[in-house]
Amino acid sequence: NVTPDKTKMIKKKYKKKIITALTISSQKDVYKYNKYKKISDIILFDGKGYENSIGFDHSLIINVPKNVKKMLAGNIKYNDNLEKFIKITDIIDLSGSLETNGNKDFKKINIFLKNLNKINVKNKKKNSIN
């Protein structure tokens, strides 16, 4: 747990971009981003457990303003409906779900990339119509 003041000091001292990770289990937890939004470059909303993340209701971050760069984690699977996450966040962290027994699983990675490519193609078609 790093306070906003400590975060500001670290950013100033090292002149690096900062990702602040918040553990989310309720709407009240989401609002903690307000303390960091002017300091951190990215706010990571994650479930409890980090590496062995417990999921949370990802829709809780819907009301976080678009000008806040959001990263979403929390038990997101490689074969989940990615479109629903893309609508509410800038970055999706699903690294752990791409592993089997602690090693990257190329089958899972390929499924994820195919699903992501379908979304990209769909969005390109949609944008070319508008």
Give the positions of each predicted feature:
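Alpha-helix-loop-beta-strand connector modules within alpha/beta enzyme cores
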Residues: 10-21, 58-78, 112-118
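Glycine-rich phosphate-binding active-site loops on the catalytic face of alpha/beta enzymes
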Residues: 1-5, 47-52, 88-109
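Generic serine detector
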Residues: 25-26, 40, 53, 59, ...
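C-terminal helical cap(s) of enzyme catalytic domains, especially alpha/beta-barrels
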Residues: 9-13, 95-130
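Conserved, mostly hydrophobic/aromatic
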Residues: 43, 57, 61, 85, ...
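Catalytic cores of alpha/beta
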Residues: 5-7, 25-39, 61, 66, ...
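Catalytic beta/alpha-barrel core
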Residues: 1-11, 16-35, 41-54, 71-74
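Short C-terminal domain-edge/linker segments immediately following a structured domain
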Residues: 28, 49-53, 72-77, 100-104, ...
